[in-house]
Amino acid sequence: MEESRSTVKEFWKSLSEKLKESLVSVMPVSAIVLILALTPWVEISGSELITFLIAALLLVLGIGMFNLGADMAMTPMGQYMGQGLTASKRLGVLLSVGFIMGVLITVAEPDLSVLADQVKTVMSGTMLIFTVGLGVGLLLFLGILKILFHIDLSVLLMYLYMALFCVAALLIDSGKGSLLALSFDSGGVTTGPITVPFIMALGVGIALTVGGRGASENSFGLIALCSVGPILAVLFLSLFAKGDLSYTVPGYSFESFLSKATLEVFGAKAGDVGQSLILLVVFFFVIEFIALKLPKVKLIQILFGIVYTFVGLVIFLAAVEMAFMPLGYKIGVQMSAHNPLIIILFAFVIGNVVVLAEPAVHVLNAQVQEITNGEVTKTQMMLALSLGVGVSIGLSVLRVHFGFSLLYYLIPGYLISLGLSFFVPKLYTAIAFDSGGVASGPMTSSFILPLVIGACVTMQGESAVLDFAFGVVAMVAMTPLITIQSLGFKSVMAVKRRSAIAIRRIMEAEDDQIIYFE
């Protein structure tokens, strides 16, 4: 009896801590929207504002429960699988499990289904989903080999991005360049809040079991590689796309969302999240039954964690759809009609704070701080991510205003990112490339993307959305590569400065001991 009371008390303590963290995450976005409602730039009605505030409270609850569930289930599941299968020393089994898991999780990812629905006029949605799943499975297969054989992530990424831009050039040459931005956006879409904690923990489990020098830096990089797979897959599919390449803006009005029954929205999201989780959970318990044989206590903890993850993610996604999508579109349309400079500055500011509300970002930051033993803190990570996302969204709206190709950002951006990777500690490079896939989560696709689409409809017209509005997710995924590696570059410079000062002091001390004879 006393033990059960202690367990309940510990649960409420953990949940309250997670809710406090999520409240701090959601408050900045909510505060900015409330301030914006007082300005003449956006007209937000009383009912819309109340809906938004209710959604914000639901967001706090959803993020808090999701983060608790990730700690209790998603992260341990990945680590146990990584450690158990690696310790068995059956390479074929480990690689096969990695490949199958990559395909299954990606096929079930709700965000990918949304993407497939948006491009079904130009390519088969089913074909897109399974091709992207195959791409992620193959890249996860490659990522596991990278950890096992300590392959340099920088070199691997350099070759992959060279191949990626070669295929992009072929796509432009074929006259289907309008699908380029959509292809790059797919990389951020497929690394969703369910898959990120699991895949990251899988990498940690494998790396810790393999051991050796640089085990901590070797554990990162799986998310980075899995983000490249979907881009390559969609680029290849786009080469064979047929039909009308025009894009129709969905109904983003508050009325279209408020007309749905609340239970209908929650029911739809429960189905999406359940579809994503069930494959992962079944696959884990099959592996557990065959190979892991975990204690009963740990299995019960994982089951409770899965429930918290499910409930938290359903609440989060429903809240986002109810208020954040229509509000983002409305802000984009109305602010850009007033003054393009205002919407560009607003995009930068909102980008700095919206990343705080991404569920998987908190999981990433906690794992980074733990793996690096505090060398890279959660605060440093959050500041670097916030700055990167803010810059990326501001630049995306600037691109919408002037109407130029996404490649003018991506080519120099990735050249800088890959160039920095040869000058900063490998740990920072691995963390940076993983962060790109994590930062571009559901808040980006459900709030920021509608905002940019709204701005594009006003500035360039609906027909230009496919060319200029899409690409914002790709930008959000790219800029953290530069900002986080800049942290590493700063640390390298600081070490060199300290070494130079220490050497100079030693030399000065030796000079003082020299005896001069007349």
Task: Locate the predicted segments by residue.
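Hydrophobic alpha-helical transmembrane segments in multi-pass integral membrane proteins
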Residues: L170-S178, V234-K242, F316-A323, G394-L395, ...
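Flexible loop linkers connecting adjacent transmembrane helices
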Residues: D71-R90, V114-M123, D152, F324-N339, ...
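Helix-loop-helix junctions within the multi-pass membrane cores of secondary transporters/permeases
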Residues: L91-A168, I344-S421
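Membrane-interfacial loop-to-helix junctions in multi-pass transporters
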Residues: E48-L53, L85-L94, V122-F130, L170-G175, ...
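Structural signature of hydrophobic alpha-helical transmembrane segments
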Residues: F52-G64, M123-G135, S186-I199, K269-V281, ...
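Small-residue-rich segments of transmembrane alpha-helices in multi-pass membrane proteins
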Residues: S30-V33, G62, R90-G98, Y159-L171, ...
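Signature of multi-pass transmembrane helix bundles
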Residues: M1-L68, Q83-G84, S88, G187, ...
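Alpha-helical transmembrane segments
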Residues: L140, I144-I151, L179-L182, V204-N218, ...
